[in-house]
UniProtKB/Swiss-Prot annotation:
Belongs to the PspA/Vipp/IM30 family. Residues 1-64 form a transit peptide. It comes from Arabidopsis thaliana. Residues 124-259, 312-329 form a coiled coil. Keywords: Chloroplast, Coiled coil, Membrane, Plastid, Plastid inner membrane, Thylakoid, Transit peptide. Disruption phenotype: Pale green and unable to grow photoautotrophically on soil. Decreased thylakoid content. Its main location: plastid. This is Membrane-associated protein VIPP1, chloroplastic. Pfam families: PspA_IM30.
Amino acid sequence: MALKASPVTGLFPPLRPTASSSPSTSSNRPCSLRILPLRTSFFGNSSGALRVNVLRLACDNRLRCNGHGATMNLFERFSRVVKSYANALISSFEDPEKILEQTVIEMNSDLTKMRQATAQVLASQKQLQNKYKAAQQSSDDWYKRAQLALAKGDEDLAREALKRRKSFADNATALKTQLDQQKGVVDNLVSNTRLLESKIQEAKAKKDTLLARARTAKTATKVQEMIGTVNTSGALSAFEKMEEKVMAMESEADALTQIGTDELEGKFQMLETSSVDDDLADLKKELSGSSKKGELPPGRSTVAASTRYPFKDSEIENELNELRRKANDF
């Protein structure tokens, strides 16, 4: 902000700034306070009045420019953010297959328009060419008429014929210029049409490739999404639980088999024990029923025994003697 001085007297309100005082001059002018004597009849010749420069505030143009620039910068940033979000939203809705189809359709539409424009230009060129030929023919005809009139001695008629001939010749020259320009336009249109046709063919071939790639990418994405939704850890934990359960069932079956085998072996051991006890009881009876200790029961003789078992086993004999000793103790 700049301070602007405006001189006033003590009797009148402050004066407004004039058109001659520019803002740049007032902004660079320092603030000042001037005291000048004023001689009036109201105060008397000896009295002095003070004329004070009233201070006014003026807006600095530089601050205005800075504020305007900051506002524009903020607006541009906001506009950029909005455009970025809009582009992201539009990109999310874009389907490559539909976009490619629409692009090919638009290119075919442009090709149709270009062909129509080429046809119109060719028709216009044909008209110009016909007009040029007609003007050239008229120019030649009037030249022949001028020759004929001059041969007949009518110079005035020959002069008029030459004027007509010049008019048609000028028209033919102008038509020739337009025709040359038209040929350049036609050549350019034909070249661009052929180029667009080749581009469309290339775009169609590329469209098929891109569509195949897009479909493959979509399929791969769906497969990955399906794989991502599968809880692999849960499936593995379920397999581990089932494995533990199967192992527990196998252990239980082995235990039951072992228990059944132990019971069977126990039964056979009991049978063997009972047979041994029976043999021991029979042996006791035989020993207790004999008349003399150490005498064999009736029907048994040493000869028969020796005859039956010709070879004696020392271990068996020792066991037998031990049994005899125990029987005598009883």
